[in-house]
Design a protein with these regions (language model features):
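Catalytic cores of glycan-processing enzymes that make or break glycosidic bonds
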Residues: 1-300
Length: 300
């Protein structure tokens, strides 16, 4: 008999209430965009404080698995990628686009500029809202949006009014709304707020992460071609090469303890944005991989 162990727990559940030291309540877990969700996923549950969990040999996980072993011969680890890194989204965000991998190696201003991209924090980290963007997103409602939701900054550039400068504030403003035109306007405001090129590191204000799928953002569209090329080099290095050894080390702090905790056969749900280091770990620990024909891991 094969069981399933979910990655997350409810932030208001008994696990968090009893042992809050194991959880980070200043963010919410989710997933980057994929073919099924262009804005990413926001699951809402807290992320794990792995530094604290590793101190006692991941006993919180060991206890869960040992209890499961009373009933099951095998189990599937849901979203095993979360043991390498988790997609953490700010509490004031609704969509997943403003998230960042945790842990991750943030980039300094100097490192960003080493790729040939002149770093401008305000322009790259704050929402890019220009007249032409508003016309594209809202059409004939652009003037209404300017009057109600935006403050004029300079020239054709705007900023969100403080009452609407996060997605959660916008969500609250439209709470209970059912008219589709108004919901479309709300979604447009969500899009404005997530239109950044970089997100600031959640722990270190001097480090930055390229925003996931930034190539579809208006702020990217506004770049010169040379800056787009520099950003693409930086982006590809960051998401596909930079973290492999780092995340391998992170996973090996945790998964061997789980695999050795019981005699159950361990299976991994390893779909999604899978870094190269995942099969290094699963093969080394003899954890079975999930293979689905319609979501092949072969890039070819």
């Amino acid at each position: 008999l094969k069981g399933d162990i979910p990655l997350g727990v409810n932030r208001y559940g008994c696990d968090v209430w009893m042992e809050p030291k194991y959880f980070n309540l200043n963010g919410q877990a989710g997933a980057p965009p994929d073919d099924f969700s262009i804005n990413g996923q926001n699951w809402g549950f807290p992320t794990y404080n792995w530094d604290e969990m590793v101190k006692d040999g991941c006993q919180w996980w060991v206890r869960r698995l040992q209890y499961m072993a009373r009933f099951f011969d095998a189990y599937r680890i849901d979203h095993v990628l979360g043991f390498f890194r988790i997609w953490q989204i700010p509490l004031d965000a609704v969509h997943g686009l403003l998230g960042q991998f945790v842990p991750a190696l943030g980039m300094s201003r100097e490192e960003i500029e080493s790729y040939g991209l002149g770093f401008q924090e305000h322009q790259f980290c704050d929402p890019f809202i220009a007249d032409w963007v508003l016309d594209r997103v809202f059409g004939d409602r652009a003037s209404e949006v300017k009057d109600k939701y935006l403050d004029h900054c300079h020239d054709d550039i705007w900023t969100m009014k403080p009452a609407f400068d996060t997605q959660r504030k916008v969500e609250k403003a439209f709470d209970g709304e059912t008219d589709q035109a108004e919901l479309n306007l709300r979604d447009g405001l969500y899009a404005l707020i997530s239109d950044v090129l970089f997100v600031r590191d959640c722990n270190n204000p001097n480090l930055y992460h390229p925003r996931i799928s930034a190539q579809f953002a208006f702020t990217y569209e506004a770049l010169y071609d040379a800056d787009k090329a520099a950003f693409n080099r930086l982006y590809n290095d960051y998401y596909y090469r930079r973290h492999n050894q780092f995340w391998y080390t992170e996973a090996m702090k945790k998964l061997p303890r789980l695999a050795d905790a019981t005699r159950m056969l361990v299976c991994a749900e390893d779909l999604g944005m899978v870094p190269d280091c995942v099969p290094w770990v699963t093969n080394e620990l003899r954890i079975l991989s999930l293979e689905i024909q319609s979501m092949s891991k072969d890039p070819h």
